[in-house]
Amino acid sequence: VQRRGADEDPRNQLVFKYAQLVDELYPRYFVMENVSGIAGKRGKTILEELLDKLKNIGYTVHIKLLDAQNYGVAQRRKRYIIIGERSDMGVNYEYPKEMEKHYTVRDVIGSLPEPPEDGSDYPGISLHRRDRLSEINLKRIRTLKPGQGREYLPKELLADCHKIDSSVIGYRNVYGRMAWDEVSPTITARFDSFTRGKFGHPEQDRSISLREGAMLQTFPKDFLFTGSKVDMARQIGNAVPPLLAKQIGTSIIDCYKRSGKS
């Protein structure tokens, strides 16, 4: 569900295409992930209609807001996970239990070497390369300490839109650095850009690399992505973190076993 733009944005109707597929395929279980905004003011009507459709098809529907940092992912990432359980399977589903241990940015990418200055991959680590920052963005990132965002920038380094009223316009976490001993912010489809979030490296004067973003999403260090840089960033940022997906999948398998169905 889009937070901005017209209410009739066609992307807001994609959830109903998903419900149509569920109706046609009629699986024992289904999983659906969506942004937290689906339960907000703009998305609430869409969510209620979606849940009604799924229930009418013949499913018991479970919905819960999960934060990936509670499931072994070093990232603050809140998403609604909707689980559908076909009515003949019984009501057995239980969401994965939260983990006691939390991981940090340092745990995940702290051991990676600094990528070359020339923009090439670090030898043996694909996609671990740096983007060249503009002169103004180099000044901005050099001003910031780990964990700080644009609210710590002096006025002369603020973007023009933030100079108007820095308290209400935009996100305070843009033009920021990650903190070593905290989880990362949500890895989005534009995490490769220093201007799009708190995606600066904690110490080095650069945005995080595609490989670092992928690792914060819990992709294996050698996982391959295809397409342009923009395509790969989108593949990484739009994904459900594999480690979280695995736990959800395991919980469904456990549910199926408890059902006694074959």
Describe the role of every protein-language-model region:
Residues 128-262:
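C-terminal target-recognition/interaction regions appended to catalytic cores
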Residues 1-168:
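Class I S-adenosyl-L-methionine
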